[in-house]
Regions:
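Extreme N-terminal starter segment of soluble prokaryotic enzymes
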Residues: 1-5, 32
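Inter-motif core of Ras-like GTPase G domains
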Residues: 125-148
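N-terminal phosphate/diphosphate-binding loop that engages ATP/GTP or pyrophosphate donors
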Residues: 17-89, 93, 101-103
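Glycine-rich phosphate-binding P-loop
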Residues: 5-22
Length: 220
């Protein structure tokens, strides 16, 4: 499989950093990789530290900001709330179709990464969630989790939610939380017995640079 849906156990787990790292690692290997964030909230075009700018930079600035997403909203809320703030709604069929168009272009030499918003069960519309989008696309998920206290429960809950609708999980990435009091190795050891059926379980130390993308080579 050459297309992946990146989601998380919740907000601020580092999905965009991980997606950008995957993209940078793929491109470093000579692959023509692309990343997209179908729905963005908290969007500000002038914010050069935004998710969109990070993904664009990791991709060599080859994509326009408009090409990165199908929907963008200003309010930093769940997509359905952010859309309502602007007096609109998200067209589910349009969103799925937009994503499928990009998934269809993925090849071994040109992998595609689609990054969700928020967590697995973050609402997109009043009846659909990020889990539903992953299921509709029928592509494997890369699940990002933090390591702060409570993350084991959050992670296992997210895994069960995905499995309940037969979404395959390709990888679990433990992205070290900035405020975690639990050593990364201990966090990995604690959750490992519960995730043995997931093909890849990787750890990512808390860093501020994409230069440490080498740990993601196993996913490519």
């Amino acid at each position: 499989m050459t297309a992946y849906f990146i989601t998380a156990t919740g907000t601020d787990c580092g999905k965009t950093f991980i997606t950008a790292a995957l993209l940078a690692a793929a491109r470093a290997r000579g692959l023509s990789a692309h990343a997209y964030k179908p729905v963005m909230s908290g969007w500000r075009a002038e914010d050069t530290a935004s998710d969109a700018h990070l993904l664009r930079a990791a991709g060599g600035n080859q994509q326009s900001l408009d090409a990165l997403s199908c929907y963008r909203f200003a309010a930093p809320l769940s997509p359905h709330q952010a859309a309502a703030k602007e007096g609109t709604t998200i067209d589910w069929e349009q969103l799925v179709g937009w994503c499928r168009t990009h998934v269809a272009t993925a090849t071994p030499q040109s992998p595609c990464y689609l990054e969700g918003a928020g967590g697995v069960m973050t609402p997109i519309t009043t009846t659909r969630t990020m889990r539903d989008l992953a299921a509709a696309l029928a592509i494997p998920v890369i699940l990002v989790s933090g390591t702060a206290l409570g993350s084991i429960s959050h992670t296992l809950t997210a895994i069960e939610a995905l499995r309940a609708v037969n979404v395959p999980i390709h990888a679990l990435i433990l992205n070290e939380s900035a405020d975690s009091t639990i050593p990364l190795a201990e966090a990995h050891t604690a959750i490992a017995p519960f995730v043995r059926s997931i093909p890849h379980c990787l750890v990512q130390p808390h860093v501020a640079s994409l230069t440490q993308a080498e740990s993601f080579a196993a996913l490519l």
